[in-house]
């Protein structure tokens, strides 16, 4: 697993305390990871 940038760590830490935010961030993270992976192997 790749190391997360500081901003991502902060968002993850925030998400850990807010289930609602975690739900949104999970969707965002999945989309972000999918996009970066897709771009890398395209």
Swiss-Prot record:
Induction: Expressed in both exponential and stationary phase in rich medium; expression is higher in exponential phase (at protein level).
The encoding gene: ymiD
Record protein name field: Protein YmiD
Taxonomic source organism: Escherichia coli (strain K12)
């Amino acid at each position: 697993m790749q190391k997360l940038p500081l901003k991502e760590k902060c968002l993850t830490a925030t998400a850990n305390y807010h289930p609602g935010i975690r739900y949104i961030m999970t969707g965002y993270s999945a989309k972000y990871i999918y996009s970066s992976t897709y771009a890398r192997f395209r």
